[in-house]
Amino acid sequence: MSETKNPGDHTLSVSPTKTLSLKRPVEAGIVRQSFSHGRSKAVVVEKVKRRALGEPHVLRESAPALDVVAPAPQAAPPAPTQQPQPRVASRPQPQQRSSSGVILRSLTEEEREARSRALSGAHEREVEERKRAEIEAKARDEREAREREERAAAEARKREEETRRLQEAESKRRSESEAKRRLAGGEPAPAGANAAPRKAPALSAAPGSAAPSGQPGPAGAVGARPAEEEDAAKRIIRRPGMPTKVIVARPVKGAEQKSRGRLTVASATGDEEERTRSIAAFRRRTQRLKGHVSETKEKLSREVVLPETITIQELANRMSERAVDVIKLMMKQGQMAKITDVIDADTAQLIAEELGHTVKRVAESDVEEGLFDSPDVEEHLISRPPVVTIMGHVDHGKTSLLDALRHANVVSGEAGGITQHIGAYQIVASNGLPITFIDTPGHAAFTAMRARGAKVTDIVVLVVAADDGVMPQTAEAISHAKAAGVPIIVAINKIDKPDAKPERVRQELLQYEVQVESLGGDTLEVEVSATKKINLDKLADLIALQAELLDLKASPDRPAEGTVIEARLDKGRGPVATVLVQRGTLKVGDLIVGGSQWGKVRALIDDKGVNRQEAGPSMPVEVLGFSGSPEAGDRVGVVENEARAREIAAYRDRQKREQAAARGNLARGSLADMMSQLKTAARKEFPLVIKADVQGSLEAIVATLEKLNTDEVAARIIHAGVGGITESDVTLAEASGAVLIGFNVRAHKEGRQLAEQQGLEIRYYNIIYNLVDDVKAAMSGLLAPTLREDMLGNAEILEVFHISKVGKVAGCRVTDGRVERGANVRLIRDNVVVHEGKLSTLKRFKDEVKEVVAGQECGMAFEHYQDMRVGDVIECYRVEEIQRTL
């Protein structure tokens, strides 16, 4: 059997000399690569061809694109690739003999069917791969055509740019040469010669313009550039004693692409020379366009509310600007600032207007705007109970009269039987009318309380004792009522006493312009007896009549407003304020502001001790929930949120501190006053630390003690507060050397123990008279006593003796009175006092004596004085100290 294999023979054979392989060997060749300095390197180059399934013409067209590396010249020509031809096993093939002489057996029917199925499947796969190859070839052709168009367009743009540049250079050169020629020939320059050269003509009409796509451009336009590049690529080396050597730099393959950056598939396979736009450049351009759009966007202008002072951070927040921009603007104006710095309203307005915003200026007091005195809706107004204040002199029976009306006993609970704080109660009269009563103290120390009671009242009941008449506090109560503009009802009390004289009371009231009805006036009057309960119903009827004339109305359907009647610090409940609701309805849970304190209503307690959920107009209640004890007389209002409550309280607290500082400045006075105070003796101070049960009593104590101040001594109140005596109070009193006083309060256990350890006495009082008297006596002890001279006698100097170790001694005769040893003396010469001092020696016949009476002679010597002459008169007297009182 022949060893030669026929081209059309596709039978499998086993060769003893060759190995059976599934792919043909790779064709390889060796290429020597040269480097600088004579170095070279042998590189093995392999050529790999991918087997493609398809028609012969498709394979021929796509074959050049499948080459990855060009074939080396040393490579042997490859053997022809055999294409598998599909065969149909229709008939059994005869047995054939292989090249080795081995006879192969014929295929069975199952094997032929399996081979047929395999061939049909291979044929289907070939068809699918052929279609896929056609699609890929078509897409590749389109991509290559598009890339060729892009490269052609890029080359055209490049040629146009080069042509335009050359034309501009040529035009510039011609204009310069023309100008030089004219200057050299002395010809005048034409008009416009110094102007800029004319614009180059259009590219379409330029002689060196780029040719249409696909046609070569003129040689003159781009012919010079390769020559220049060739000259630049040459390097001449001259060495002494050796011939000149010219080295031409070889172009490095792929150097241009490496210098341009990252290579893409299109740039690696194509021949384009211009680099296309990268993704990063596209992103940067998009961001620039976005930024341009945002800059051209119209800026929003806002209305900025500016208080009197504001921080830079808050100003930036209100303008919706960055704080950095505000600081930059201030730095441009020459001001260095931080975001926490506070600026005034004028500076803030300039900044806001510079940034394009409008400004609305507000004052600090605007935080209280709308808190009080807002108008009521007429349809919501209903009748309210009258608020009646009982006023009069101390011990005229005000509280007893109120007890008789309330059927209670308040007097027994008051220390000393006098009212020392305001009490507010609501009763229902016999005629069914609810009446709110406010009981005020009658003592002189409680002037502020009476004025406060008159301001919140509708009717004043002036109580005058029939047996005592009009007293100073009665006249003061009349003044308060007239100042408040409220009507007065005169209640002549104690008519059951035998020495009662109601007519005298009526006559005395005329001195204060109070004319009762019985004397033809318009002031209502009634004679009552609190102890015997006489005419109490008549008093209630008069109050109801006066209230009906006043037509008292209020709206309960609105935020509550009221006034603090009294305030105290309770040990278990905290700050407690007695509030008289004047308008609206106060409810549990409301946010309220009173003076410089704010809080949330935790509980409402009426005068009977009953917890209530709400309190309407003219109802007095105890309010729990304040952050601190408000001051009596402060107005209370309900606000909508906690932020505004804090803002109002902070503003009032700031105002309070500023007023206190202003009072301190006024007390210091001018520079002349300060100098005069320095010249005189310093005023002695009596330091005090006072704690009281309620705000009203504390206010009265402080006001009374301030009235005791004189030019020589003053009561210095270091601290005055409401509540029990604590450790801090004891520490403060010990450090300042003050007297610690408790009025109707006691010291806590810790404070009492600390006071015992420090040896500090705590003085407790429950009657204001005793407190004021003790403080007055202590302050009187600080006063310098009054000096009074008591004349003893006179003596005349008859002779002056000089005695060694003693000095001068005057021999005298006592003319009147007596002279005592150690007494004060004056030396009078020609009716002029020349010396004041004391006697150091008094002798009679060489004996020391205590005194010498008139008509006797004696010897006298002065302390630290020797200038005595015959005829001088010695006046002897004694100084007596008399204690002063305030």
From Swiss-Prot:
Chain intervals for the UniProt region annotation (G2): 417-421
Binding site for GTP: 392-399, 439-443, 493-496
Positions of the tr-type G domain: 383-553
Keyword entries, A-Z: Cytoplasm, GTP-binding, Initiation factor, Nucleotide-binding, Protein biosynthesis
Alphabetical list of HAMAP family matching this protein: IF_2_B
Purpose of the protein: One of the essential components for the initiation of protein synthesis. Protects formylmethionyl-tRNA from spontaneous hydrolysis and promotes its binding to the 30S ribosomal subunits. Also involved in the hydrolysis of GTP during the formation of the 70S ribosomal complex.
Protein name per UniProt: Translation initiation factor IF-2
Origin species: Methylocella silvestris (strain DSM 15510 / CIP 108128 / LMG 27833 / NCIMB 13906 / BL2)
Native organism taxonomy: Bacteria, Pseudomonadati, Pseudomonadota, Alphaproteobacteria, Hyphomicrobiales
